[in-house]
């Protein structure tokens, strides 16, 4: 009798350890912290696209090709490259972390590092306060980046929007 209860206890302990190990692995796989699931200097192309769409301007040190920031921008089809590059950046972020990456992107400080003259890259991404184009207007557009009318990317729970994007989970 004692042998049977020992086996049952051992079996129960094994099952519990397996369940806890699976839960820990799942939690580690969905860790959407900045620097873990996505880089902390992310979405430079999305910053350019957001400014292009909301403010009709390009950022100094834009990561877009020079021909896109010139007067030739009015040719049909060229503005879509900014969207394409942004959507590619978002697609590289794990599906369950895209909303958190957008939250982080909206909260980043204004780029303060100088432009690298060889690459044209600004030190960080983030939204910029520009005359006539406040950050809140840009945030409204950032919320739409994963939506069907923009990048059409699935996020957490397989939906194409970010619920409560104003509330960062990493604070």
Curated annotation (Swiss-Prot):
What CDD domains is this protein classified in?
AAI_SS
Gene Ontology CC, one term = extracellular region
**Keyword line:** Alpha-amylase inhibitor, Disulfide bond, Protease inhibitor, Secreted, Serine protease inhibitor, Signal
Signal sequence interval, chain numbering: 1-24
Q: Domain of life, per the record?
A: Eukaryota
Which InterPro entries does this one have?
Allergen/soft/tryp_amyl_inhib, Allergen/tryp_amyl_inhib_CS, Bifun_inhib/LTP/seed_sf, Bifunc_inhib/LTP/seed_store
GO MF annotations in UniProt: alpha-amylase inhibitor activity; serine-type endopeptidase inhibitor activity
PTM summary from the entry reads: Five disulfide bonds, which are essential for the inhibitor activity, are probably present.
Tissue/organ expression: Endosperm.
Tell me where in or outside the cell this protein is found. Answer: Secreted
* Subcellular location, principal: secreted
The protein's role, per its UniProt record: Part of a complex with inhibitory activity, but CMd is inactive as a separate subunit.
Protein family membership: Belongs to the protease inhibitor I6 (cereal trypsin/alpha-amylase inhibitor) family.
**PANTHER family according to UniProt:** ALPHA-AMYLASE_TRYPSIN INHIBITOR CM3 (PTHR34481:SF5), TRYPSIN/FACTOR XIIA INHIBITOR-RELATED (PTHR34481)
Q: How does it assemble?
A: Heterotetramer of one CMa, one CMb and two CMd chains.
What name is this protein filed under? Alpha-amylase/trypsin inhibitor CMd
What gene is this protein a product of?
A: IAT3
